[in-house]
Amino acid sequence: MKKNILAILIASSIGLYGCGNEGEVTGKPTIDPIIEKSLKAETKIKFDLISNPSAPVVIKPTYLAMDKNDGTLATEKLAKDPTKWSDPLVTMGKTDGWSTNQPIIIDFTGNDLDSATAADGFYLLETGDPTSKDYASIPPKRLTQANGDFKVFASGKTLTVLLTKPLKPASQYQFAVTSDLKDIKGNEVGMTNSYAVLKSTTKAPVKELEPAQDLTHASEATFAVAGIDKNKIIFTSWFTTASAGDVLFAGKAATALALKNGAASVWQGSAIGDVSATDLAKLYTMTPPTSAGNTVGGTNEVYTGKVYLPYFLETAADKFSTTPWQSGMPSLAAIKNLLGDETASSADKAIVMQKLTTWGITQDDLENVGSDPAVQLKVLPLLTGKTITLSDGNQLDSDRLITRYSPVPKLKSVQEVEYTLVLPPAASGCQANEKNTVSIYQHGITASKEELKTSSLPDTIIDSTCNAIFAIDLPLHGTRGVTIPGVGTITASTKPEIFLNLETLPVGRDNLRQSVMDQINLRVAIGRLFASIKQGNADAMGTFGWLNPDKGVSYIGHSLGAMTGVALGNVANRPLGTSAADQQNDALFFNINKLALANPGA
């Protein structure tokens, strides 16, 4: 997809209408005296959409670098090489918003800044979406340095805002810089011609400029409501923060629907790759455990078996390191953008509306899906597996990026994953029906589940209690390596770089996502054992019958396993719904009762 940065549109339009550069504006336009004074400042904010339209200078985070077509960042246009996925700017272009904790860096030209005035000239608000219908009804919330929300520093020609509290995910924020910020000569900092065009009350010279100008006016009005003198504002920006956990929760919701209606009802159409019906039917099942000796201390017994888990990454040698998760549904952002785009053809709009109507999705659903969890739970399953082909034969949202607007991942394969199970010996009295409380253990980077066989950890955890410990390898670790022709099988247990994947950052991100989903779905498989035990089948289940279905499941994670556990605890315990049935399903199949996280990130 070709990304369109609004900043480039603005710069190109201004260039066509006779603007010179940041030092001059041709045509002798009428300029507001306040703007005119600001433009004469020796020290100005470094924001330039005019001088070089092919390489605009923008201040991030900003709405100017958002792609309205699919709701993602368009930062790859700012990268030297937009195809180089090791560049964070390119990777950010695959996400649905800006960081919740990354510092805001604002550069200036001219003189150095006066550090004593740094905190006086910066303001940050949590707001509604200025493009939404209900924006005016949402009062802005002011974040301050005094309340510990952020700290502002000035050094040289750079103003740095350090977020000491993370911003909310999938939320709207606006920041402003005012002339209360001074340079070392004691003079007010000023705006550039680029911002002057957006701030001016004179109508934009071309239609393409109007959205940015309208947003700037709305933003300055919002700061005025919050008590900031808009005549002092020399720059504003609005930005959306990235979602956190939406994709993983969508994966959990898809699993819940698969449990309820069958896996084939969820993983179908464009939401599934080359997966056979036989493999699909194995999802969330476990083979009976077989004896594999004892722990290193000889105290407890080790068993092994297979668990069948959904896998959303590629496994082929030529794809596993370069292909991130893909969405199994068309993007809601792409759908809404097309329907609201004045330049879109009536034929395409008719096609989309006809499809939505056929699938049972209303216009009200589209309006509320971003904010109403109940509507989300309705719409996402209806779109999963679907494809929209436009009048020219092209597919709407052919990129199928994973975002909060298209969070359901495409199933690439059903993985047969080896599990390890550690149980107390017969002499303990624990080898009886419904005796053992269940825990899941997850190892760290470069390690493997074999830690349960080669260390004293399981003996320490079990001690003298009736406790069962399950473990599987992280993706690409241990028994889950990748076979490379001419090389053999490689694993992250010896080559951690294949998991971290700094060459293709989105794949590194999704390796971690897959790690979390594996634990969620292992928990589901254990929950299915619990359900069978509760139905009175313990006698026929052999070793599995010894598990206690009434004590829930705990999680123990070390290093990368602890990092996985942070997300697992959040998503596994996030309710699927409010009904009694939803709560029962969460407790039986998903919830994690206790978390023990050692050295996350170490």
Predicted regions and their residues:
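A catalytic-pocket lid/entrance helix-loop region that shapes and gates access to the active site
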Residues: 190-217, 491-499, 576-602
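A conserved hydrophobic secondary-structure block that centers on an alpha-helix together
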Residues: 153-184, 407, 411-455
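Primarily recognizes the serine-hydrolase "nucleophile elbow" in alpha/beta-hydrolase
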Residues: 540-602
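C-terminal motif of bacterial Sec signal peptides marking the signal peptidase cleavage site
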Residues: 15-18
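Cap/lid segment of the alpha/beta-hydrolase catalytic domain
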Residues: 383-408, 430-529, 535
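Positively charged n-region of N-terminal signal peptides that target proteins for export
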Residues: 1-5
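N-terminal cap/lid segment of alpha/beta-hydrolase-fold proteins
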Residues: 288-434
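Acidic, low-complexity Ser/Thr/Gly/Pro-rich repeat segments typical of extracellular/periplasmic
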Residues: 21-324
